[in-house]
């Protein structure tokens, strides 16, 4: 497993060792890092970033002790859920302890001293291409947009290789960390573009009186009305169903895992709802009980 540990601090080694190591998917300056720093700064904690190439190494890093926690994207308001990540949550023992929402602002950046007219090629991730296509078509059609594996890595390469005439579309954090100049901020087509990130950190304890959200995974008997019964119970106990995702159970035709997010006003009422619904469920797995992000 390849991981990279980053820190912006110039602390002594023992101070660095005391900083919480947070695993993320992506490269220095990516939106995962932005989400991680936003969440932990509110907690008053300094962190070191453990960068992983894909999502499963986040969990491996926590298992191996290379990371103390992980921050993982789970859904986006435009592209929907990251389906493989639901399976990772079910497959590993780490519980959700919080969440954070980040508005995805895409910025066109390049080495300082250039104008948009000087840029001939832009590198970025395919999702960022889809989110910014209209800007390039309407404002700078001479630029060739090239798909890259990661938004932040594109910015890193431009800075490290001194590439003139080449731009990247990435976060403002990527521009700041790599000394790039933002030529055009906020070039995404849809401004209401948010990604939800989950906090997986066993060191965090959330008081019960502050818990107002839970993520569950369960299966149901393969018979008519089984899901409707669960939804009726949740409604009776005033549970707000904010997300439901079904995924096939391998080896079981037309049977599914159900992943559910529910919000509630009191923890006791939530536990009552869970107690009432549990006899109708199979293989209930509480993936996390936490304070929702406002």
Give a label for each model feature.
Residues 2-294:
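Domain-level signature for soluble enzymes in the chorismate/prephenate branch of the shikimate pathway
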